[in-house]
């Protein structure tokens, strides 16, 4: 369409009518329906949604931003509001600003699907809010459109990580691109433990539900990763996200986590199934909602098709009811401090060989007893910087300094071996 019409044209003498209530809303809906009829020759009816999940809007935004020809821009709504928007696109190899048609203040239609979208601005207390409307030619078109949303969302979600964060106003949901994939070969941990974890993941996603039905096993699994920070729990999760053909969702537990946010997250995660749901810092679950969380896990369909991965740095804070029970967390794995062999493997992979000989790397691996992978990473950065600036290194001195700092900062006994109750 070259000449895109306006639903509500501005006139000075009518500006009071633009701020009215139902009268203005009824006028706008009528004009939208008339404009759709004029364009396509069929009547589009307004539908209301009782579903808090509105993924179809995400797909519309993606189509508009990508320049897809499938959604047609039918009309603007208010003449004096925005027609275009800009955003910083972090998903591109070279992030930059993009300019695209506005979703708000516009009417879009998928004529072949028989549905249309309108994000209508309204004015309240000096602010501009918006009201989302969905139109369809008939119930059959609406059902067919909604049935097609989930497969497309599932494919879209495989390319990104869906991040749920519980905040003061409820759960926010964003999709973040996997900027740097981690290969399984880059995960350094006990070989037997690594094999067992990946095998359980692969069994879940590479077999269909018939295996679970045949052996009467719930099609829902869960593992808990625990241990001191900086030892590869996050790296392991990233490698899983980049190596399975399924969506991965990430849920950050906070003090704002409530029964409402728990229900909202699981409802959204079920729509992505089969999928992985990573629950970060599960020990931070507020005490007053832990029973609700356990009941949600026990629900007949609450986790169908979901592989749960819980992570914690403080396993002693975990509710014992979570563990060793089918449908909750079936297994717990300690991701502990690396031994000398693993430290040596990490240091070789990280690139210490650029400025250290083979013998010096082996010696550094011995000296760094008690170091986490994160601390070894810090040691690499410091050593590389010194090598670049001075042409030499004093890695033994650096290790000694870091060891002293580590001893000063350590607190509590949970990091000590044989103090954790999960085996």
Swiss-Prot record:
EC number per UniProt: 3.-.-.-
MF-aspect GO terms: ATP binding; ATP hydrolysis activity
Gene Ontology cellular-component annotations: cytoplasm
Xref: CDD domains: RecA-like_protease (cd19481)
Top EC class, one word: hydrolase
Subcellular location: Cytoplasm
Superkingdom assignment: Bacteria
Major localization class: cytoplasm
Keywords: ATP-binding, Cytoplasm, Hydrolase, Nucleotide-binding
Residue sites binding ATP per the record: 227-234
Functional summary from the UniProt entry: Shows ATPase activity.
Protein name as catalogued: Uncharacterized ATPase YjoB
